[in-house]
């Protein structure tokens, strides 16, 4: 990314709420001694500075979004009219470099290629070794922090480069609908993603190198060489898709770059034609015939040039489309070949049609024998088993009659009063002789029985 005009990263950090006015004096003071006297206070300050630096870089307030250079320009970006320049930036840089959060560019590239990098919140054998060396005294952590000297060289911000790589990859996958749409030249890559994610339009050589190495060796989402950048598909069907073919991919890259150049030129011609139309209309209104004719001739020349550009682009689109179709057919052929091999293997395991016929014949024989056995069992009925035997029927009728008799007796008793006549009322001798209640008669009969 090219150099930007001076911006006040301090004001940006205050507006974001990263720096609070109550803490500014402490943040801009020399707090290196807190590393020993008050470790918690030191850690609070360096954490705040880290957030301010990384956020300012990502938002374009520093010279790069992903690489830090602790030079005069960097310090000026955080200068304060009231407090001057921060006095502990050297200690802040030394601390986060030792923590592996900001990595020297060459170390970053080497670790990417070796696969040594992990997430900042993760563990690896290398982080364990670094911690062990610090404990054993092989690294004098305190001396570099207390010296408060700004380190030289370029340092990669891991958090920011991972964020940028994620955005670029997501956009590339959104655009990737065919084989050729995954291939970029370096310039086409810059033109495609630059307008979206870096306002300057171009990543410088160092930034491109860091970004591509991270995405290639650490995230495994693309491959690249000095000319071609190729995003990898999510599913690997053909090994060719996961490698750069110098002849095929090189030709595709040339076609894509040519199409992009023609599209850019066509856009410029359209804008120029629109301007000429406006000027021509003004000349016609003013009656300036000579000027109007000049503009009209110029417009016709540009219109023919635009037609040629459109025709050329259509030809390139046709070639690119045919390449995509050929690749699709190749993938389809590979899939069909794999399916045919799988089908052959399954048929071989089945033993051919003769074995299938033998199996089916055995199945039919087994079913026939099973049906014969079932029919034999169903027809079996010994002579001494007779469910309609007269003795059984007579015994059943006797049981029913006995049950009915019991129910009648219970029903009759339910209607008999157990009270004596004296308990209810007193009858005269005449009435007693003349009338006897029906319940009493039934009760007397039952007693006699």
UniProtKB/Swiss-Prot annotation:
GO molecular function terms attached to this record: membrane grommet activity
Disordered: annotated span: 421-449
Gene Ontology biological process terms from the UniProt entry: intracellular protein transport; late endosome to vacuole transport via multivesicular body sorting pathway; mitotic nuclear membrane reassembly; nuclear envelope organization; vesicle budding from membrane
Role noted for this protein: ESCRT-III-like protein required to recruit the ESCRT-III complex to the nuclear envelope during late anaphase. Plays a role in regulating nuclear envelope (NE) morphology and nuclear integrity, particularly during spindle pole body (SPB) extrusion or insertion through the NE, and perhaps during karyokinesis.
Keyword annotations from UniProtKB, A to Z: Cytoplasm
UniProt note: phenotype after gene disruption: Suppresses slow growth rates of spores and severe nuclear envelope (NE) morphology defects of vps4 mutants.
Family statement: Belongs to the SNF7 family.
Keyword Lyase set for record: no
Record-linked Pfam families: Snf7 (PF03357)
Localization in the cell: Cytoplasm
UniProt name for this protein: Charged multivesicular body protein 7
Record's compositionally biased regions (Polar residues): 421-430
Any one cellular-component term (Gene Ontology): cytoplasmic side of plasma membrane
InterPro entries: Snf7_fam
Keyword flag Cytoplasm: yes
């Amino acid at each position: 990314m090219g150099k930007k005009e001076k911006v006040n990263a301090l004001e940006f950090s205050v507006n974001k709420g990263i720096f609070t006015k109550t803490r500014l004096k402490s943040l801009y003071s020399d707090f290196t001694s807190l590393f020993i006297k008050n470790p918690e206070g030191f850690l609070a300050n360096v954490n705040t500075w880290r957030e301010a630096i990384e956020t300012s870089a990502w938002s374009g307030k520093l010279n790069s979004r992903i690489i830090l250079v602790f030079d005069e320009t960097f310090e000026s970006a955080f200068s304060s009219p009231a407090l001057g320049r921060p006095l502990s930036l050297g200690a802040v840089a030394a601390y986060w470099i030792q923590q592996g959060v900001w990595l020297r560019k060459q170390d970053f590239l080497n670790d990417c290629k070796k696969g040594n990098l992990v997430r900042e919140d993760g563990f690896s054998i290398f982080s364990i070794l670094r911690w062990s060396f610090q404990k054993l005294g092989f690294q004098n952590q305190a001396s570099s922090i207390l010296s408060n000297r700004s380190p030289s060289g370029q340092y990669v911000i891991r958090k920011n480069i991972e964020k940028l790589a994620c955005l670029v990859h997501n956009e590339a996958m959104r655009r990737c609908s065919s084989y050729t749409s995954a291939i970029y030249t370096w310039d086409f890559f810059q033109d495609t993603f630059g307008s979206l994610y870096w306002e300057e339009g171009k990543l410088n050589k160092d930034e491109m190198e860091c970004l591509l190495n991270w995405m290639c060796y650490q995230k495994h989402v693309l491959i690249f060489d000095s000319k071609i950048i190729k995003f990898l598909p999510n599913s690997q069907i053909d090994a060719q898709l996961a490698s750069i073919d110098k002849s095929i991919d090189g030709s595709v890259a040339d076609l894509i770059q040519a199409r992009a150049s023609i599209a850019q030129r066509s856009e410029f011609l359209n804008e120029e034609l629109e301007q000429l139309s406006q000027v021509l209309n003004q000349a016609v209104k003013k009656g300036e015939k000579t000027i109007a004719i000049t503009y009209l001739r110029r417009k016709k020349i540009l219109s023919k040039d635009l037609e040629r550009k459109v025709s050329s682009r259509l030809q390139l689109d046709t070639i690119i489309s045919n390449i995509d179709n050929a690749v699709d057919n190749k993938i389809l052929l590979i899939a069909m070949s794999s399916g045919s091999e799988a089908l052959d293997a399954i048929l071989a395991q089945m033993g051919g049609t003769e074995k299938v016929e033998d199996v089916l014949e055995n199945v039919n024989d087994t079913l026939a024998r099973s049906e014969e056995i079932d029919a034999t069992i169903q027809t079996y009925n010994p002579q001494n088993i007779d469910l309609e035997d007269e003795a059984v029927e007579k015994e059943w009728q006797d049981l029913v009659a006995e049950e009915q008799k019991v129910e009648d007796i219970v029903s009759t008793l339910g209607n008999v009063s157990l009270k004596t006549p004296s308990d209810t009322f007193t009858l005269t001798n005449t009435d007693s002789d003349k009338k006897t209640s029906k319940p009493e008669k039934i009760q007397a009969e039952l007693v006699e029985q």
